[in-house]
């Protein structure tokens, strides 16, 4: 990792981020003011926050409740990805176990996944909703907190830069100003994808970038989550 975390205004809350990978979602919660602790069953040497290598199925929900103000997670999306649908290959699905842990903890939670994943009444976020992003990258967010989007997703999205000569707009767009595709055929360079997603340059590997979401998504959601925590504690009389 070769970047310095930018300054932000701490909100005094701590959030646990499960299946954190290299930290795209965690970075957004950090920008929203949370202190973040990441959990993943694989080593994550590029993760920029305190990190615990463990399987979420080993976590005690009571321990989680006592040590954190909120919980977040991005269980592996392979089981619900376009690739799985095209190939018919089966992948392990951690969504039920993630939900079970979060609900048992009683904490406000957010769970993120790809379109098509079986999330409950999810909010959909898209890069077009955020100033400065140049990706579509639709993602679903399930929560026990009422979440809203910054604006509606347009019916038609901007054309994306492509290396695919079969596309009618091939050669007409610049990857540093147009929308880009981070994964899949005809995708952009890693550097342009980082810029388009609001990811600091030089932080993530290409695989990490492929699995990440724009931090702007979880910064937006994190601010709503923090407001909910304060409001809930005000109602219950617990010091905010």
Locations of the language-model features?
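S-adenosyl-L-methionine
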Residues: 1-34, 38-39, 45, 240
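Short, well-ordered coil/turn elements that cap or connect secondary structure elements
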Residues: 10, 31-33, 46-48, 65, ...
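Class I S-adenosyl-L-methionine
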Residues: 18, 40, 53-55, 59-70, ...
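N-terminal beta-loop-helix "entrance" segment that forms/cooperates
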Residues: 43-53
């Amino acid at each position: 990792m070769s970047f310095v975390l930018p300054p932000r205004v701490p909100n005094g809350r701590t959030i646990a981020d499960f299946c954190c990978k290299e930290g795209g979602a965690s970075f957004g919660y950090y920008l929203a003011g949370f202190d973040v602790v990441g959990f993943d069953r694989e080593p994550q040497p590029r993760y920029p926050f305190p990190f615990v290598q463990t399987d979420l199925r080993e976590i005690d929900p009571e321990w989680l409740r006592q040590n954190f103000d909120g919980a977040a997670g991005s269980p592996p999306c392979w089981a619900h990805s376009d690739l799985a649908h095209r190939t018919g290959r089966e992948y392990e699905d951690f969504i039920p176990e993630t939900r079970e842990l979060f609900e048992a903890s009683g904490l406000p939670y957010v769970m993120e996944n790809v379109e098509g994943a079986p999330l409950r009444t999810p909010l959909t976020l898209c890069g077009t909703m955020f100033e400065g992003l140049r990706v579509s990258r639709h993602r679903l967010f399930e929560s026990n907190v009422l979440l809203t989007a910054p604006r509606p997703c347009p019916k038609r999205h901007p054309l994306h830069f492509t290396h695919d000569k079969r596309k009618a707009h091939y050669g007409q767009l610049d990857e540093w100003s147009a929308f880009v595709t981070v994964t899949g055929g005809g995708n952009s360079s890693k550097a342009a994808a980082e810029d388009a997603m609001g990811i600091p340059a030089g932080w993530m590997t290409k695989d990490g970038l492929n699995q990440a979401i724009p931090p702007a998504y979880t910064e937006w959601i994190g601010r709503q989550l923090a407001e909910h925590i304060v409001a809930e504690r005000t109602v219950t009389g617990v010091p905010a």
